[in-house]
Amino acid sequence: FARAPYRMLLGPDARISGVHGRGCVCFSPEPFVTVRGRSISTFPMKGTASSATQEARRWLETDEKENRESATIVDLMRNDLSMVATGVKVKRYRYISPVETSKGSILQCSSEISGLLPENWRSRLGEILLKLLPAGSVTGAPKEATCRAIAEAEDMERGFYTGIFG
């Protein structure tokens, strides 16, 4: 059991780092954003099912709640990317991929949203991240109202909680 956390760190999506004297560990396969050249993309993951059942894929494709949640978050993330990029569009909507976990394979429903950053994006990276954070796939929608509700309900800052990494 003591080696279980170490084994998890060997996975392809594990990250570990020290930030401001604290250790942070991340196991999420969902990237907040990726940037290649000037292209910025986000891949919100909404909808998970065990791949052990024959019906899992069809359920992910047809479940009304899963479809509505994906539509809401994809629209939110598309709007967020539009604050920092041009030509933002949904490239792939609700594609299903297997994800390997320590407890076996699951099916994950994701979407891909991309746009073009300005030429000077590197000199504005902090500003860009501040406009995009917190990640809409974590907060849900409406993002601003959710953040206000959390701030009112909690007595302390969350610090490094369900954020981005890497």
What are these regions (language model features)?
Residues F1-G166:
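Extended alpha-helical targeting/anchoring segments
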